[in-house]
Amino acid sequence: MTMKTIEFTLIFVGSALATSSEGAEIELALAPTDSKFERAAAFTTQPTGIWQGEVGEGFRPGVQTLSLEAGGAGGFAAFGGRQAHDFALTSVSYGYMLGKVVGEGHWYRGNWEIRGELFGGLQVSPSRNWLVGLTPHLRYNFATGTRWIPFADLGAGVSATDIGPPDTSGTFEFNLQANTGVHWFLRDNLALTFEVGYMHLSCAGIHKPNLGINTLKGLLGVTWFF
């Protein structure tokens, strides 16, 4: 009996070329395997930096943000308030992306972010007074696939001010916020940030009077992502 030998040459993962002693070449399919090589290759192709994929395709879990913004707020007499209160405002905030991109395949695809904001300002009308506040926010960043990343958020926190009657009467106030805006990325991890929003100040009846202060604000600044 004559024994035939077959030599195998690996040409790529998933197939091989077999050559018999008679010179015939046979292509064989190999079953896929979960080898260390394949796992290492998959690992090295994972995205790096702040993005889950390309720029604008959503943020990676754990990405942090630092924002510095300035602007103003125009008051209006509504919901019981008797005066329009106008402010010059500054804000610094820190954020953290809670998880992976959600809503894949839908227009609302994006990331949830928690933020802590410290803001301060000077009331310029109807009188000169000060205002400071600390507010946690829940923000949603839309993954558009472009350098324009819109967002929307809600916040509720505490404030201190020396604004007095007729609309407030105590130093301690709560603040409620609803905001929307956009990040425009100048480079991979730095964006211009513009936002507009509504802010309400009142003490929930702890002091009297408690008519409340209502404003519409606009802020412009920069945000670092890391």
Sequence positions of predicted segments:
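Cleavable N-terminal export/targeting peptides
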Residues: M1-G56
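Short loop/turn motifs that connect adjacent beta-strands in outer-membrane beta-barrel proteins
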Residues: E54-V63, L98-W112, P126-R128, A143-I149, ...
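Residues that define the transmembrane beta-barrel architecture of outer-membrane proteins
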Residues: G62-Q64, A84-T90, R128-L134, W148, ...
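Transmembrane beta-barrel strands of outer-membrane/channel proteins
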Residues: L66-G74, I114-G120, A152-V158, F194-Y198
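Surface-exposed strand-loop-strand hairpins of Gram-negative outer-membrane beta-barrel proteins
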Residues: G72-T90
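Sequence/structural signature of outer-membrane beta-barrel proteins
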Residues: A73-F79, V101, F119-S125, N141, ...
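Outer-membrane beta-barrel "beta-signal"
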Residues: V92, I213-F226
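Residue-level signature of outer-membrane beta-barrel architecture
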Residues: Y96-L98, Y140-F142, V182-W184, W224
